[in-house]
């Protein structure tokens, strides 16, 4: 299932795929997706909480580590393994701590609590060029508000895939998301 779902997401034009570690057999899924599409996309894991999980993601072929929190040890381990680190942050202090630890970019989470206004305010203290993705609450109907607030991208999770979704369902969701994003 993982390869088929990843394939339709890529076909829609989305080139970053994270497999949540709280899903069934996540490391097997990462490995099979990397084998099929590793040259076409940045593939890795979400909900990464420990340095041991970082090593497992790398062993599965992943190049991307996304966390719901800001753990400097996880960030450092991810960078040491040559992967991209996108920790979850909610406050300016967490954002700056993540960047100091070497984060590639930031996952503003939960985005619906911070809102576009929260992101816009946080930009005042972030180093120029810092990539920030809004996660949790970003959807096609509010992409434009997030972009106006300087979001660089989005993490979409269940907006694009829920367990039990068919490839056709995911393809339709992914295409609608890309169409909405491209319309901005």
Question: Each predicted region: which residue ranges?
Answer:
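Catalytic cores of alpha/beta
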Residues: 5, 50-60, 93-101, 124, ...
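Glycine-rich beta-to-alpha transition loops that act as phosphate-gripper elements at the mouths
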Residues: 23, 43-51, 67-71, 87-92, ...
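Structural preference for beta-strand elements that scaffold enzyme active sites
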Residues: 16-18, 40-44, 63-64, 84-86, ...
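Conserved N-terminal beta1-alpha1 strand-loop-helix module at the mouth
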Residues: 1-63, 80, 139-141, 162-184
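Glycine-rich phosphate-binding active-site loops on the catalytic face of alpha/beta enzymes
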Residues: 64, 68-74, 108-115, 149-173
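Conserved functional loop/turn residues at catalytic and ligand-binding sites
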Residues: 13, 37, 61, 69, ...
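CoA-thioester-processing core
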Residues: 85, 116-126, 132
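Histidine/lysine/aspartate-rich catalytic loop segments that bind and position anionic ligands
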Residues: 64, 68-114
């Amino acid at each position: 299932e993982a390869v088929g779902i990843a394939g339709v997401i890529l076909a829609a034009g989305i080139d970053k795929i994270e497999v949540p570690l709280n899903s069934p057999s996540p490391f097997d899924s990462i490995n099979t997706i990397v084998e099929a599409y590793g040259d076409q996309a940045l593939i890795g894991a979400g909900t990464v909480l420990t340095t041991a999980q970082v090593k497992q993601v790398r062993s599965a072929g992943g190049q991307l580590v996304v966390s719901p929190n800001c753990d400097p040890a996880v960030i450092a381990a991810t960078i040491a393994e040559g992967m991209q680190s996108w920790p979850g942050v909610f406050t300016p202090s967490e954002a700056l701590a993540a960047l100091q630890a070497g984060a590639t970019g930031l996952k503003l989470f939960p985005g619906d609590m911070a809102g576009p206004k929260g992101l816009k305010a946080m930009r005042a203290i972030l180093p120029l060029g810092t990539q920030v993705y809004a996660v949790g609450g970003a959807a096609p109907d509010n992409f434009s508000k997030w972009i106006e607030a300087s979001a660089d991208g989005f993490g979409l999770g269940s907006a694009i895939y829920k367990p039990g979704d068919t490839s056709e369902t995911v393809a339709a969701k992914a295409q609608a998301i890309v169409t909405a994003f491209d319309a901005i």
